[in-house]
Amino acid sequence: MIVNYLKNKFYNLLTTMIVLFIFVLSGAIFLTFLGFGLYGLSRILIYFRLGDFTYNRSMYDNLLYYGSYIIFGYFIIFAVEHLMDYFRKMLPENAYFRGATFHLISYTVATTLFYFIIHLNYVYINIDFWVIMVIIGFLYVCKLQFYPESKNLNNRK
């Protein structure tokens, strides 16, 4: 009886450890690819003299500085998109929350808030507003292309 209990406990622990390992490994791979992508983007901006990144301390300081810039920016854009979706659900008949006008308003509000709330506070990152508009616009178009307005697949009626 105790042997079976320990065997089941070990099996559950082993299964949990395998799932946790896969989760951590996939997260590490994602963060590595994200880091390489952002490193490549920063090199492109520097090469074409569209951006200047002057914060250069230790690896962990750089990771914290530039990482917080990206995370705070993502939070702002995420919050604006969800707020705009909430407004669209609450006001479905409003012309501003349909079609291209909705996407233009979402993009404009997200870009403006990112610039004034996040970007201006990071003095070691110098990127012009129009470059930020192009980058966020490209990301917004990719989001619309790869994640279209889909239905909730969990609602079974």
UniProtKB/Swiss-Prot annotation:
Signal peptide (from-to): none
GO CC terms: plasma membrane
Known function: Involved in multidrug efflux.
Entry's family note: Belongs to the multidrug resistance efflux pump SepA family.
UniProt membrane topology term: Multi-pass membrane protein
Organism per entry: Staphylococcus aureus (strain bovine RF122 / ET3-1)
Main location: membrane
Protein name: Multidrug resistance efflux pump SepA
Keyword annotations of the record: Cell membrane, Membrane, Transmembrane, Transmembrane helix, Transport
Subcellular location: Cell membrane
Stored InterPro entries: SepA
Disulfide bonds: none
Transmembrane feature ranges: 18-38, 63-83, 100-120, 122-142
